[in-house]
């Protein structure tokens, strides 16, 4: 017993180390800039009161343009910009930037570039390089242009290069992150390279010689030579021609021009507004649309809540006077008694007796029960991750780049969720062990000693299996991406980092959670409510007619129909998230508040459906031996079915909406959506099981205490 404090200290130290590492990873990209610490006055502190302060520039200050990667909506394979065989390579003094964990997972590869930018100084024409490339390089260029790849650049630490367009709904200017690598002539099917870029950098003057950058617009052009067209349209475009000779070299001219323009209407605090919404709806209409969707979800939840309240009141108060159920006896010859022939027995049947029968007389498969507890612990860990990360991220309302905060918090809570998963798994194991073995002991002391036996292996499985499965699956998919030389492949150092976190933090946290759960005694009513003799000889139990267990399709249809309602609640936010992550990688999802509220409503709805479903099972399936022995699985499947519909919608989105090309990209999309939706199913299933188990046990213990 003396080693437990040491385990606790080691575990807490590991948690602190992980939090410090993730904190440094998160803020590392914030400290990169042009090398100057901004001097902020007291008035500017009030103006930029937030976690991130702007960089201030004076005329002539150097500004670094960061090149990153190229990516396409048609594939899941981004590539580093400087790894491409047709781009201008960096000079010797240009270095790669340190990447945070979020950027590595997103596939970023940031480098300093040779583009010369000085604040406030226009440059009408500048030659970057004449890139020498081979036939293979030209083939790669033609392939990427045909697959719709866009180039991702950055300035001022995190501000993306943007393509500008005017919305057809409100006629306002909007940005789409990145600019196309080239284009295809629809008439001739020829491809052209964007080898000239006109950079328009917009700045806002907040004070004398204190300027902030609020926009980075890129206007790409395809030019056949080294001259800069400017606003002229009278120039010859550069056609991508693949040479026939393997040894023939092609020289690609790259030029650029820079213009600085002052922006009076947009300040630094609102520079991301142009990237949001993408102009499909006006800002007011978009917010109204989400509020209407949220109102519909609230209406669904309130309707189900009303039904749940009626059931709860009827079970807990109205039926209390009728708690003594009729006796359904069977004689030796199998002839039913007069009580059994009551035509109205199903309508008058008491759920109290069914609850007692399920808990005391159910004969679940012990291995299946252990598997169920494992799945419930997985779901608890995922719920802890989603709700915890969104709660913290939504509180960061003054953090400009919320994407980094969500991903960082998700990783942190997923690691810390090992404690919650092992805690819940150990407690459930203690409860089910209590109900299963109490009748076998005549000595209460021996019984209490047995049910408190601690199983470290099972505890570690509860807390560490889900992170291990996700990690192994990710590494397997990573090998596919690595074979294509894509930047979305995790580097070896990152893989070692995740494995270290798993063995140093997840496993000790799992063990610690099980120890804590095992040292907390069960409530007294759990022990006092279970008699030493669990037979039905007192005449108050349920004697089910001897029948062969068989598959009941109506039960399964009803269970899996329960998943439609959760999909209706989360459907709109799923559309926006999928569009941001898959359909248009260049857009930003920013409705985290609506997403958080939708998830809360989803959880409430799942809990209510589990109560309604378990009540209906007790009312109409009390003679079903399969339901009696596996009621825990049925309650779990009620919530699990919601994730099944989410996965079906994900498959529809991948094949019908995304139009992804390539077997590898399709396989990666399907696998990642399957991993995520399985975890969603486990989370909803765990919530459904815990709620239904609480409801059934509350009925049972209330009956015992009558």
Curated annotation (Swiss-Prot):
GO terms for cellular component: Golgi apparatus; Golgi membrane; membrane. Residues 1-33 form the signal peptide. One of its GO terms (biological process) is monoatomic ion transport. It is a multi-pass membrane protein. It comes from the Eukaryota. Residues 34-290, 393-405, 478-494, 575-592, 659-665 are lumenal. Pfam families: EMP70. It is found in: Golgi apparatus membrane. Keywords: Golgi apparatus, Ion transport, Membrane, Signal, Transmembrane, Transmembrane helix, Transport. The chain crosses the membrane at residues 291-311, 372-392, 406-426, 457-477, 495-515, 554-574, 593-613, 638-658, 666-686. Its main location: Golgi. Residues 312-371, 427-456, 516-553, 614-637, 687-706 are cytoplasmic. Belongs to the nonaspanin (TM9SF) (TC 9.A.2) family. With EMP70 and TMN2, plays a critical role in the late stages of a nutrient-controlled pathway notably regulating FLO11 gene expression. Acts downstream of RAS2 and TOR. Essential for cell adhesion and filamentous growth. May play a role as effector of cellular copper homeostasis. This is Transmembrane 9 superfamily member 3.
